[in-house]
């Protein structure tokens, strides 16, 4: 998912973890419930602390670092929003470090469809004690509504492909060639949900654990835009619920007393801060005001690694890369794309700019993803380092080759090459990375690059409209399978590189077609239909097509760095895709 950062906020304001007003206004009818303590899990109840925004010692304070555009499970695309959703909603299952475990569902069965194709029909039995935060029962109809909502043409969700590519009838509904009733998700009764897949999918339960598949109540979503961030309207079914939201400041998540597993939830709640300045974030932690933050200054990483036992750094299933707009002039030439890619010293970026243990990348799929054999898709040396692939040397620039490709494109030594705009958004080390790329391309290729930075809301609109040439982009896995990365570039995937061989209803303005995408799509389709080593072959084939066409320019595989104050908090950490799961956290000490 996109790692999104929206707003930079004044350090002085953010350091004072002070009281702020809730989003409901004094004259808002929803505010009439603010003092109601009869139902301790009532949405809109902001009496959780002595003053709005203040928290007691039983609240964990966590710097989210980002203010997501949405907390709506079917609309959100960011890890920031995903972290909120994972803690206020409960899907049918959860993906944990120990594997898939039951959540709102207490059991499931897998069977054949009417044509006799095995492993295509999943039947989930829901817990009868699962409740929404307002006390209503969670039913199979809530999941049916949510999953059909995710693929509805009216919602036009960016993540519709996570449903369209797997559930029978969903793609047709989304494209307008079918109806809502054609989507093969059905509540057989209040506590039984049945879904039929297009073909067997080995990782379907991993998909179901993702936030796009979380439940949503029709009467809640139909209240209009903005319900997901309004504490008076946002009704959820997870271990916590949204008690308070202050733009530019924080969210308060309060323990949901109607949660089916509430007895094992030890926190009174979580305060999530929107501090995007890494120095301010670290200062808050070192002052004892923040227990968890991953927003850390790159220059401080060596010190933290050497001195702070609360600091951890571990590989994650993500990639930072340059996305080429395959329909844009200049970079629609593969020689230009290869020249730009080979002229980059990735090791220098990792060692001197990031300094956080990030791994130079030579392809799309991170080393942590495994094939059916347990092996990585990456070529690794005897020390576990990524090796050269697709002509990309992860340990240095291939300057001579890069210049040859640029000359083949008609720009020897960069002569006549137009000024190139490099777009990025405000986040962490993005500016330093952009400046390093600008310098490398000038020194190694003789071309001029103009840096263009936007705050995230503007950036998202720019990318969605296709109004860019190249951009620094990042993606973290939505589920623990190589397809989580590879499916992005299918004709019906998110595909912000706009590399499609056929038009797609989800991006109606992307009408410039790229025929070389078809063999990629063919391999993706076959990888979806097959299992084991046969599937492994198609996954590799798809990545080969993508990288041989240099649709993206890999920079580095992401690393998860954070500090967790173990003198104040105890907990198991993150899910396999890097989401914080606070259900089992406990505050210790004072």
What does each model-found stretch correspond to?
Residues 107-162, 287, 330-332:
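Aromatic- and charge-enriched surface segment that lines or borders ligand/interaction sites
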Residues 98, 172, 180-182, 190-191, ...:
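Gly/Pro-rich hinge or "lid" segments in bacterial periplasmic/extracellular proteins
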Residues 254, 332-439, 443, 541, ...:
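Append "and occasionally in soluble cytosolic enzymes with long acidic Gly/Pro-rich linkers
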Residues 63-115, 235:
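N-terminal lobe/hinge region of extracytoplasmic solute-binding protein
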Residues 61, 139-146, 190-196, 238-239, ...:
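Alpha-helical secondary-structure segments
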Residues 243-254, 271-328, 351-353:
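Extracellular/periplasmic solute-recognition and catalytic clefts
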Residues 20-29:
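Bacterial lipoprotein signal-peptidase II cleavage site
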